[in-house]
Amino acid sequence: MNQTLIQEILEVVEQAAIASAKLTGLGQKDEADAAAVEAMRLRMGKIEMKGKIVIGEGERDEAPMLYIGEEVGSGNGPGVDFAVDPCEGTNLCANNQRGSMAVLAASDTGGLFNAPDFYMNKLAAPPAAKGKVDIRNSATENLKILSNCLDLAIDELTVVVMDRARHKGLIKEIRECGAKIQPISDGDVQAAIACGFAGTGTHCLMGIGAAPEGVISAAAMRALGGHFQGQLVYDPSIAQTSEWADYTKEGNIKRLNEMGITDIDKIYEANELASGENVIFAGSGITDGLLFDGVKFEKDCTRTSSLVISTLDSTCRFTNTIHMKDGAKSINL
């Protein structure tokens, strides 16, 4: 992996975001996702690399492109593994709600955990709390620790939690401690990363979301120096989702074992989910969000707002890009 790859990866998420944004608010979540997938795949194909999708749009027989195991890039150059979500928050995009973005994580070959399409209990917190809060603790204990780490009273803390029935008890406990809840309907990657930056108004992410997105969040938090832990959830009664109606707890354990995951209750740290020597996170807003704006279409240009975090050069780049149209006559600042 090299410096040139950072710019290339930025352009990958920008193009995916633009493609999805054209369908924002139209109620067409599947079409928005498909547009982002196609745009991301097309731009990836132009990169000089031996790329491979390790987390993507599903198995080979489930997705036409960006499927797990698909080779991307020119076939020459450095080996790069990708975890991608071309339109994270498809419902958010379809309904023109905040928080949808095109997102990916990249690392050296073998550097990203090949997460199953399961759920994951997650804990994200700022760099000041890294290694101090712990997913094994109760929410109450972690809020006390976080309060000390950030020198804030508990009633000054805001915790992001997915608005799901499974989190009823968690939300109750957090509020009884005096902390505030910021519920989100979808898309916990941006919420997790926002915890790593001061000034976003959010201090912690707790609760259960999708495991593949957990790997992307972990990559970003590792590069940022923030705290992230994840634990796979294999019990459908805990996840409380109809998507697992055909699976039993025993069946899910069998699936994990078949994937080579025998320590099914393992707590994964950020540097285990994103273990490569080099790690890059890139996200570009489709709709406005906690970290950056969504795509803006203007008469003579299209504007994107993005974030790239890289261990290659220890940088966080917030990037506003103007994509000029042919024959553009006037570009506003």
Curated annotation (Swiss-Prot):
Which pathway is this protein assigned to?
Answer: Carbohydrate biosynthesis; Calvin cycle
Biological process (GO) annotations held by this record are: fructose 1,6-bisphosphate metabolic process; gluconeogenesis; glycerol metabolic process; reductive pentose-phosphate cycle
Q: Recall the GO molecular function terms of this protein's record.
A: fructose 1,6-bisphosphate 1-phosphatase activity; metal ion binding; sedoheptulose-bisphosphatase activity
- UniProt keyword annotations, A-Z: Calvin cycle, Carbohydrate metabolism, Hydrolase, Manganese, Metal-binding
Q: Where does Mn(2+) 2 bind?
A: D85, E88, E213
Highest taxon of source: Bacteria
**Annotated Mn(2+) 1 binding sites:** D33, E57
Quickly give the catalysed reaction: beta-D-fructose 1,6-bisphosphate + H2O = beta-D-fructose 6-phosphate + phosphate; D-sedoheptulose 1,7-bisphosphate + H2O = D-sedoheptulose 7-phosphate + phosphate
Cofactor names: Mn(2+)
> Subunit structure, briefly?
Homotetramer.
Role description = Catalyzes the hydrolysis of fructose 1,6-bisphosphate (Fru 1,6-P2) and sedoheptulose 1,7-bisphosphate (Sed 1,7-P2) to fructose 6-phosphate and sedoheptulose 7-phosphate, respectively.
* Name the record gives this protein: D-fructose 1,6-bisphosphatase class 2/sedoheptulose 1,7-bisphosphatase
